[in-house]
Amino acid sequence: MADPTVVELANQMAEECLAVQRETGQERLFMEVAAVLGASSQTMEEAFVTAIRTRLAAAQGGDFMAK
């Protein structure tokens, strides 16, 4: 399991990234951010991608249940 600080930072970055994606319409921005993170820290990249995926999955699940 990742260091709690890594998870916290990844969660913050995921929230910020998804907000920018909504504002700009760049649906794959998170992939570019993940690549930048991965160049420095594979651990941070994995935590960030996990944070993004869980948020996207939760949103899709919520949309499905709302139908």
What annotation goes with each model-predicted range?
Residues 1-25:
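N-terminal acidic leader/helix
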Residues 20-66:
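Amphipathic, hydrophobic secondary-structure cores in small proteins
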